[in-house]
UniProtKB/Swiss-Prot annotation:
HAMAP family: HisI. SUPFAM superfamilies: HisI-like (SSF141734). It comes from Bradyrhizobium sp. (strain BTAi1 / ATCC BAA-1182). It is an enzyme of class 3 (hydrolase). Keywords: Amino-acid biosynthesis, Cytoplasm, Histidine biosynthesis, Hydrolase, Magnesium, Metal-binding, Zinc. Homodimer. It comes from the Bacteria. GO terms for biological process: L-histidine biosynthetic process. Binds 1 Mg(2+) ion per subunit. Pfam families: PRA-CH (PF01502). This is Phosphoribosyl-AMP cyclohydrolase. One of its GO terms (molecular function) is phosphoribosyl-AMP cyclohydrolase activity.
Length: 131
């Protein structure tokens, strides 16, 4: 059976990336055809930045790399899941995961608030991404 990803109108598929050792969700990003091909060919995670309209290899600026242990696709082949060996932080904020805030319901008004969890920074993003 062939891997034939179904890209959206922008030429992208959603990618969920988890830590292969812990199962923790590290990040959600997007991949275009080139990012998928490079990920398969190199065993390193490559993504497509919608904000920069550019291909990028995880860790090329920060040194916080992802070695792919396994890649899966969903039933429609319009999303992929990477299980990776994460070196350092996955989030551009310097945190291990991009999911460092829990959403909790507020009793008083039935709204929601954010609570920081696992929010320690592993690196200073201002120092790493300084231009």
């Amino acid at each position: 059976m062939a891997f034939l990803p179904k890209f959206d109108a922008g030429g992208l598929v959603t990618c969920v990336t988890t830590d292969a050792a812990t199962g923790d969700v590290l990040m959600v990003a997007h991949m275009n055809d080139e990012a998928l091909r490079r990920t398969v060919a190199t065993g390193e995670a490559w993504y497509f930045s919608r904000s920069r309209n550019a291909l990028w290899r995880k860790g090329e600026s920060s040194g916080q790399t992802q070695r792919v242990i396994e890649m899966r696709t969903d039933c429609d082949q319009d999303a992929v899941w990477l299980r990776v060996e994460q070196t350092g932080a996955a989030c551009h904020t310097g945190r291990r995961s991009c999911f460092y805030r829990r959403v909790e319901r507020t009793e008083a008004d039935g709204g929601a608030r954010l609570v920081f969890v696992d929010a320690d920074r592993l690196f200073d993003p201002d120092a790493v991404y300084r231009k």
